Design a protein with these regions (language model features):
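C-terminal transmembrane helical hairpin of 12-TM major facilitator-type secondary transporters
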Residues: 272-318
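Cytoplasmic helix-loop-helix junction between adjacent transmembrane helices
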Residues: 100-137
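Helix-loop-helix hairpin linking two adjacent transmembrane segments in secondary transporters
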Residues: 134-181
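Conserved MFS/SLC helix-loop-helix module at the cytosolic interface between two early adjacent transmembrane helices
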Residues: 56-95
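Juxtamembrane intracellular "pre-TM" segments in multi-pass secondary transporters
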Residues: 181-211
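Extracytoplasmic gate region of multi-pass secondary transporters
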Residues: 25-27, 206-259
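Helix-to-loop junctions at the C-terminal end of transmembrane segments
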Residues: 58-69, 259-271, 358
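A late C-terminal transmembrane helix in Major Facilitator Superfamily
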Residues: 326-361
Length: 391
């Protein structure tokens, strides 16, 4: 239990910083737009560059994470991403700003796979599942901290503070993981198969294709929709950027408890994940669709919050239930990398689509697209179940 506590605490703290960095652009978008130096299109380019490099990096670093010691990848990833964010406020050139977010994406892609590998291969299945629930909780604490920093301080300070903490944590995490390795508290399974065979082996793992589709849906929700949340609050609903950040913080707090709700419901319904996903996808589709007819901004916030809560429950089933169950395969980092890569490629494409639609068509069409994401998820669960029956 002591080992699980140390492993869990180290990984969770690292993941909070990870998600602070991942969502900092989203919460600071209204402030950046007010400067007059940033446009929606340029911010979309920044976020999509980050997403694409994160996706590619997840694929590459996911497999490397099953070969090399996670402590090197975790510490180096924090160092690179932190340095990129510290430099960003001081760079006036758009192309170099995009380069900063490219380094941010690739640096952060070095974290999740090795972190999941550390948890899954060094704790019992029950402990791993519980730690990963807190892992998901941490993924919402990061955006919450980012929004609070944005509310209290200027956008420049928020970037510098986030990057500085990441750089400092890169050294702290390396020291902690090194000490635990020397004491024999943690060890890692190294894959013996490399190259194309290693890639193909991932696709032989049970249910991988179904969860690849789920990953696309939850990452579009977590990354693409969340990216434009504060913009939705300021531009579509007319809130000030300060109020928008407060609302964003409130939504993040509520969503942070969804992993615990998911685990409790999952156990209560005897670990039947597919029926649970059908409910969450249905709720999300309906709530997003209600935004089209809503004329009250507070009701719109309620509908959006419920939709995002439902998607967060689905996300928890993927990251807190399915991934930790693969510890004995020795390919946790690889599977995580493939799933996150595909998910973020989908999110990057959706991000550009949403930006184009909201600029040239209107928000109602954006709501329709968001609702369709839930519909696609619902249909996928029935297709997957039908194939299981046929087999």
């Amino acid at each position: 239990m002591k080992k699980a506590s140390v492993v869990g605490t180290t990984c969770i703290l690292t993941y909070v910083v990870n998600y602070y960095l991942r969502h900092i652009l989203s919460v600071l978008t209204p402030a950046l737009l007010l400067t007059g130096n940033f446009t929606i299109e340029h911010i979309a380019n920044l976020s999509s560059t980050y997403m694409l490099l994160y996706a590619v990096g997840q694929l590459v670093n996911g497999f490397l994470g099953d070969i090399f010691s996670p402590k090197y990848m975790i510490s180096f990833g924090l160092l690179v991403s932190g340095a990129a964010i510290v430099l960003f406020p001081f760079i006036p050139w758009k192309l170099l700003q995009i380069v900063c977010f490219a380094f941010l994406g690739f640096g952060l892609s070095m974290l999740r796979g090795p972190l999941m590998k550390t948890i899954s291969e060094n704790t019992s299945p029950n402990h791993a599942r519980l730690i990963c629930v807190f892992f998901s909780f941490a993924s919402f604490c990061g955006p919450l901290l980012a929004s609070l920093f944005a509310l209290i301080n200027g956008w420049n300070f928020a970037f510098i503070a986030a990057g500085s903490v990441a750089v400092a944590l890169s050294f702290v995490s390396y020291i902690i993981l090194s000490v635990m390795e020397r004491k024999g508290l943690i060890s890692y399974m190294k894959t013996k198969v490399t190259g194309i065979a290693s890639v193909l082996a991932v696709f032989k793992i049970e249910n991988i294709f179904f969860y690849l589709v789920v990953a696309c849906i939850v990452e579009i929700s977590a990354a693409s929709i969340s990216q434009w949340l504060t913009t939705f609050l300021t531009v579509s609903l007319g809130f000030s950027k300060e109020t928008a950040n407060m609302i964003y913080s409130g939504i993040s707090v509520i969503r942070s408890f969804m992993p615990f709700v998911s685990l409790a419901v999952f156990r209560a319904i005897k670990e039947r994940d597919i029926p649970m996903m059908r409910v969450t996808f249905s709720i999300a589709a309906i709530m997003f669709a209600l935004l089209i007819v809503s004329s009250d901004k507070w009701m719109s916030i309620l509908f959006l919050s419920i939709a995002l809560m439902a998607m967060s429950c689905t996300s928890a089933l993927l990251w807190s239930i399915y991934i930790p169950s693969l510890g004995k395969t020795g390919r946790v980092s690889s599977v995580n990398g493939v799933i996150d890569c595909i998910g973020y490629i989908a999110a990057a494409g959706a991000n550009l689509l949403f930006a184009n639609v909201m600029s040239n068509v209107g928000w109602n069409t954006v709501y329709i697209l968001w609702s369709l994401i839930g519909v696609i998820g619902l249909v996928t669960t029935f297709v997957f179940n039908q194939r299981k029956v046929q087999r």
